A protein has these predicted regions:
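Short hydrophobic core segments
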Residues: 7-9, 114, 129-139, 178, ...
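Rossmann-like dinucleotide-binding cores of NAD(P)H-dependent redox enzymes
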Residues: 84, 89-95, 99, 166-167, ...
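A Rossmann-like FAD-binding core segment of flavoenzymes
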Residues: 73, 108-111, 115-123, 129, ...
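FAD-site-proximal beta/loop scaffold in flavoenzymes
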Residues: 152-171, 254-327
Length: 457
């Protein structure tokens, strides 16, 4: 039996970060992973989709290069196999990097399935491991709901989750996407950009349910303008090979496509944890703001705790959990200050309250909304569509939320995340000099608008 101070199950963005942080703090650490280092995010999620989106953006930009005075002879085309190959190379480089970091930090790595026998004992194949603290980072799996015919279509390879779709070797001409959340709209953007006929079937009233209404309205209009068909308030009733039957307002219809993407969410991966008898919350491991479970010395981070299924949240939870486990001063996680990003053309970045939530809580708030056209850099870049919307407490100008719909929006939201974490006000952040010409002036103008009035709007 080998003894460890910290044992981490799962090598995704939560698990490997937790393992490295624990080793940096002087602990003897083991990391167990049954599949690939990097988890869903690196292998089948965040990074692969961004690689595809970069190729899509390049393709779209070249097609409009005449707007910038550039001429392309004989048109432009794409090679799907080369796009796939580029994605695979990026993923391989990053997974190799994680492996290097584990060795650098002297972390023992076990490749296999972890069966937890007790809070301090874990079996991995023939290895029995003992640990003082246990970090569960087993992630989640894509969910295929019990729709008649869905499992059969999945087994035949016609219906796919995001994991399989990212390995697609041939380009589909028609794609049906069940689910209008983040995964659904990002894949819709990818395939639409290369010319696929894309339809999104969403059960709720809108896509991206829960995001600020102004953002959802603008983004929906943009997707539709690009040629993506969006059907809301839809119930998928049957899948028969490549045919998806749905009802909308009582009317039944069937749509045929080359590929069906099931993007209705994920389920926490609890396999191997049964003997712990952990307290659950909606089929995810229940945790507090230090990621502690119902069992002392056992922590759960990332998708498995169901709080926010985002890679950056998992990584942060890993650091907090390990710091707390090793009895160092840990800062509890405030889950109301989590930035969320959606990648497309344009992008969406959001943190904190939406205007609708502020209204529902009957808060005395002020909304400052600035058009992207007020920023000179955006015009030079040939990007005109978008806005930033800042929500503040009217009395003290405390930042309640920020919602950005613009190109490179995801690179702007961190300023607000820092401001909110430090409990700064719109006035205090507006005193920082923002460089010109940069896209950061969009958030600066929104701050000025919250304090008094913007300069360029």
């Amino acid at each position: 039996m080998k003894n460890y101070d910290v044992l981490v199950i799962g090598g995704g963005p939560g698990g490997y970060v937790a393992a490295i942080k624990a080793a940096q703090m002087g602990a003897k650490v083991a990391l167990v992973e049954k599949h690939k280092l990097g988890g869903i995010c690196l292998n089948y999620g965040c990074i692969p989709t961004k690689a595809y989106l970069k190729s899509a953006k390049m393709y779209k930009d070249i097609k409009r290069c005449a707007d910038f005075g550039i001429k392309v002879k004989n048109g432009v085309s794409f090679d799907w196999s080369s796009i796939l190959s580029r994605k695979n190379k990026i993923v391989a480089q990053l997974t190799t990097g994680i492996s290097f970091l584990l060795k650098k930090n002297k972390i023992d790595f076990y490749h296999g399935f972890a069966s937890v026998l007790s809070p301090c004992e874990v079996q991995v194949d023939t290895n029995l491991l003992h640990t003082q603290k246990l970090i569960i980072a087993t992630g989640s799996n894509a969910f295929v709901p019990p729709i008649p015919g869905a499992q059969e279509a999945y087994q035949k390879g016609i219906l796919k989750t995001s994991k399989e779709l990212l390995q697609l070797e041939s380009y589909p001409s028609k794609v049906t996407i069940v689910g209008g959340g983040v995964i659904g709209v990002e894949f819709a953007t990818i395939f639409n950009s290369f010319g696929s006929e894309v339809t999104i079937l969403e059960r709720q009233d809108t896509i991206l349910n829960g995001m600020d209404r102004d953002v959802v309205v603008a983004y929906t209009k943009k997707l539709q303008t690009d040629g993506i068909q969006i059907l809301n308030q839809v119930e998928v009733t049957k899948i028969n090979d490549n045919q998806t039957t749905y009802t909308q307002k009582g009317n039944a219809k069937t749509i045929t496509s080359d590929v069906i993407l099931m993007a209705v969410g994920t389920k926490a991966n609890l396999a191997g944890l049964e003997k712990l008898n952990l307290a659950l919350n909606r089929n995810s491991v229940q945790t507090d703001n230090f990621c502690q479970t119902s069992i002392p010395g056992v922590y759960a981070i990332g998708d498995v705790n169901g709080k926010h299924m985002l890679a950056h949240v998992a990584s942060h939870e890993g650091i907090v959990a390990v710091t707390h486990a090793l009895e160092q001063k840990a800062h509890p996680i405030n889950y109301d200050r989590v930035p969320a990003c959606i990648y497309g053309f344009p992008e969406i970045a959001s943190i904190g309250m939406t205007e609708q939530q502020a209204k529902e809580k009957q808060m005395d708030y002020k909304a400052s909304k600035i058009s992207l056209g007020a920023v000179g850099k955006s015009l030079a870049d040939g990007e005109k569509e978008g806005f930033a919307k800042l929500i503040v407490c009217k009395k003290h100008l405390e930042i309640l939320g920020m919602h950005i719909y613009a190109y490179n929006a995801t690179e702007l939201i961190s300023e607000m995340a820092v401001g909110m974490e430090l409990e700064g006000t719109a006035y205090e952040l507006s005193q920082a000099i923002h460089p010109h010409p940069t896209l950061s002036e969009l958030t600066f103008e929104a701050l000025l608008g919250a304090v008094n009035k913007p300069i360029h709007a």
